[in-house]
């Protein structure tokens, strides 16, 4: 399972929000590029960037920080936040971003999601952010009547590369992922699902391994990395590729004596 560090950008700085509340932001670094490099050094294979200003504005805002991070690291970078038209998506992909994450337009303009998935195959991911099973939009400032699982099925049919599922009530809270909701969603679709929100410990990450057969292929970790509750290199060793439970024991010659 892929462990993906999150870097949330607000005013060019690396922050974390509590349950998506912009009034409850905590600055973790003035230099997001250094943060990105740190996660790469600890073994990250992918970075997850969220343009929080962009999510509110409905268009990319932290472009200079995003471009600087993409240039500074040699691993794929995925970006979400405020991507609501083709030009914004193309702009980020032209900067060297590997995958873009669409949220609001998945609810408001599914036809555009289909067009983008066809134009940029493998590079369009849909972020489904849910409050009590219903999809939130516009930087989590609004909640729709659309059910998360229903939207996930529609998006899978449209050809998206993956779905990121965030439980808003758990995001930034360190209360653990919503395992039942993740299982329901992953079982309902045939595209990879990435879990996001609430991871607080290695135990939480290990609990997600049970969902791998259902199609949960990755997990985004934010606050727990910044507070030190989760050590990235340890997490990758525990649940990532080549994790200890996948490695056969070294029997040694004595086993055959």
Swiss-Prot record:
Any GO molecular function: 1-(5-phosphoribosyl)-5-[(5-phosphoribosylamino)methylideneamino]imidazole-4-carboxamide isomerase activity
Known pathway: Amino-acid biosynthesis; L-histidine biosynthesis; L-histidine from 5-phospho-alpha-D-ribose 1-diphosphate: step 4/9
Keywords: Amino-acid biosynthesis, Cytoplasm, Histidine biosynthesis, Isomerase
Cell compartments where the protein resides: Cytoplasm
Keyword Flavoprotein: no
Lineage: Bacteria, Bacillati, Cyanobacteriota, Cyanophyceae, Oscillatoriophycideae
Protein name: 1-(5-phosphoribosyl)-5-[(5-phosphoribosylamino)methylideneamino] imidazole-4-carboxamide isomerase
Primary localisation category: cytoplasm
A family per Pfam: His_biosynth
Gene it is expressed from: hisA
UniProt source species: Gloeothece citriformis (strain PCC 7424) (Cyanothece sp. (strain PCC 7424))
Catalyzed chemical reaction(s): 1-(5-phospho-beta-D-ribosyl)-5-[(5-phospho-beta-D-ribosylamino)methylideneamino]imidazole-4-carboxamide = 5-[(5-phospho-1-deoxy-D-ribulos-1-ylimino)methylamino]-1-(5-phospho-beta-D-ribosyl)imidazole-4-carboxamide
UniProt cross-references to InterPro entries, sorted A to Z: Aldolase_TIM, His_biosynth, HisA_bact_arch, Isoase_HisA-like, Isoase_HisA-like_bact, RibuloseP-bd_barrel
GO biological process, one term: L-histidine biosynthetic process
Annotated active site: 8 (proton acceptor), 129 (proton donor)
This enzyme's EC code(s): 5.3.1.16
Similarity comment text for this entry: Belongs to the HisA/HisF family.
GO CC terms: cytoplasm
């Amino acid at each position: 399972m892929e462990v993906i560090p999150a870097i949330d950008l607000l005013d060019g700085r690396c922050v974390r929000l509590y349950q998506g509340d912009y009034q409850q932001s905590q600055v973790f670094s003035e230099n997001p590029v250094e943060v990105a490099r740190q996660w790469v050094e600890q073994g990250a294979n992918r970075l997850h960037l969220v343009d929080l200003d962009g999510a509110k504005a409905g268009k990319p805002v932290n472009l200079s920080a995003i471009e600087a991070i993409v240039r500074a690291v040699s691993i794929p970078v995925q970006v979400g936040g405020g991507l609501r038209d083709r030009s914004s998506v193309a702009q980020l992909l032209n900067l060297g971003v590997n995958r873009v994450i669409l949220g609001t337009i998945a609810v408001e303009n599914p036809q555009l999601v289909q067009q983008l998935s066809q134009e940029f195959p493998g590079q369009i991911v849909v972020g489904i952010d849910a409050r009590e099973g219903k999809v939130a939009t516009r930087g989590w400032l609004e909640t729709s009547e659309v059910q998360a699982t229903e939207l996930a099925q529609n998006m899978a049919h449209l050809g998206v590369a993956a779905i990121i599922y965030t439980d808003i009530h758990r995001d930034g809270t360190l209360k653990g992922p919503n395992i039942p909701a993740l299982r329901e969603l992953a079982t309902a679709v045939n595209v990879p699902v990435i879990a996001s929100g609430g991871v607080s410990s290695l135990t939480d990450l290990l609990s997600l391994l049970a969902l791998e057969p259902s199609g949960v292929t990755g997990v985004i970790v934010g606050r727990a990395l910044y507070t030190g509750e989760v050590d990235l290199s340890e997490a990758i060793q525990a649940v990532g590729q080549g994790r200890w439970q996948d490695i056969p024991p070294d029997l040694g010659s004595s086993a055959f004596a």
